[in-house]
Amino acid sequence: MFSYSSVCLSKILYSYGIYAPSLKAEELQRHDSDDEDGQLRVIIKVTPEGFPPLIVKIKDDRDVSETVFESQCRFSEALAESGIPTARILPVVGENRHVLNAQIDSRPVFVTAEAFMENEVRSVDVETAVKMGTLLARSHNVSEERQCHVPNKVLFDPFEDNELFYALDFLSLGDRMTGENLYLHREIALEYQRIMAELEPLHLRPKYAVQGDISDCNCFFTSDWEIGFFDFNNAGDNVLFCDAVMQGLFAARLMTYPQDRSFSDEDLVNAFFRGYCSARPFTEEDKKFYPLLRAVIDAFWVDNIGWSRGNGWAPCKPEALYAAVENEDPQAVQRRLEEIYNKLTDRRQI
């Protein structure tokens, strides 16, 4: 297992211009893969004597280059310079970069150091959703104005394999359908293809850098109770409107919420976009595309289809389509398909 010492952390801080006689370290997160991908991600809260606490990130990801890591840091700093609250990332002393190349525990790794942000957002309510939407819109404005780019794939690109809806996984189930269910599956597939053809102009829009994961655990409250964000690990280039729609539904459905919540998912969606449009109004073309993109996301939402990531399928909920297919229950399959078809042909306006 990967290990590091206080002496190692002191040397890292020295590279960032922090000279402290002692420090305290608390490991907050670790992903140390022993399989062939060999990925490593360790996040450590380091408090040097006489200095505010910092977050030191140690990474070894064979799929992400130093160029990508540095671009993510520079994008975060570009937002901060334009007034967007982020965790400031320290530059390496005497060098025009933020990512430090280091050898730790006989392993070459990339290292960054950034400010530790207090007051992490713990749950999302309507007011918080408005603020998250506003924050995202402001960051989009800066990214577009400053022509920011990060050469990395994102989680929420609706024209690629993504983390919110599984249209391609739905299509792969076609060879397990029979009778009327096979016919309905084909009708859904055709409607999906028609919608994606209509969305093609959206696909062709220019892409700009986005933070890529505006979740509760990546956001913090500022001293005046606005919201900022940190963790640009998933930052990359996306069509800004697509990022807005995907992030809005992500915030409304897959966050932590108050136990005594009195609001619906749709209340959160509307709140998020109310905040977003206050800083970056949707264009008439956006409003035309929204019902189509929303229909695809709602129909093939992860919980509707079932997980198929990694080795084989692992349905996340019993009511997922794949669960019905796996149970060889044609009536349940039909109900799921009808629900998916109804969502795909619904046209929710913004």
Give the location of each predicted region.
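Conserved NTP-binding catalytic cores of kinases and kinase-like/nucleotidyltransferase enzymes
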Residues: 1-91, 223, 344-350
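Active-site acidic catalytic loop and adjacent metal/ATP-binding pocket
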Residues: 35-51, 55, 194-242, 348
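ATP-binding pocket architecture of kinase catalytic cores
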Residues: 51-150
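A glycine-centered beta->alpha junction motif in the catalytic cores
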Residues: 95, 107-123, 170-173, 298-315
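A cross-family kinase active-site recognition segment
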Residues: 123-182, 207
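Loop-centered beta-sheet repeat module
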Residues: 163-219
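Active-site activation/catalytic loop segments of kinase-like enzymes and analogous catalytic loops
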Residues: 241-280, 296-313
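ATP/Mg2+ or Mg2+-diphosphate-binding catalytic cores
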Residues: 300-350
